[in-house]
Regions:
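Active-site-proximal polar cores
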Residues: 31
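N- or domain-start disorder-to-order transition segments that initiate the globular core
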Residues: 3, 7, 11, 17-20, ...
């Protein structure tokens, strides 16, 4: 499966599961997501689930979004929390002008691994 193109965010989260578990001790010890895992999370577009399509997001339906957060939490609750918080920030995008959306949510504001 190509983690960047799978239409199912739960499958993308599951695909990252082993990497998340391996990083869990480091995350707990350093209180940071390792850069390689953070890049994979960005590449998987899990931070863009609730971002409207017009702003470059996936506009994921709520039940599927919750199932994806639950899948991430099975591997590490702090990863699920980070993805949840990032997506909560996306909710304002529907109320912003396109230029503002681009300034906030486009590359490299979020991560260089994310395509516009």
């Amino acid at each position: 499966m190509d983690i960047q193109t799978s239409p199912d965010p739960v499958a993308r989260a599951r695909e990252l599961g082993a990497e998340i578990v391996v990083a869990a001790d480091e995350i707990e010890r350093t209180r940071r997501i390792p850069e390689a895992l953070l890049e994979r999370l960005h590449a998987s577009r899990l931070f863009r689930m609730l971002l409207p399509r017009a702003a470059g997001g996936d506009e994921t339906e709520p039940a599927l979004y919750v199932a994806t957060i639950e899948e991430l939490a099975r591997h590490d609750a702090s990863i699920a929390w980070n993805v949840f918080v990032a997506n909560s920030s996306c909710l304002i995008a529907a109320y912003l002008e396109p230029a503002t959306n681009h300034a906030v949510f486009a590359d490299p504001a979020w991560n260089s691994a994310v395509d516009d």
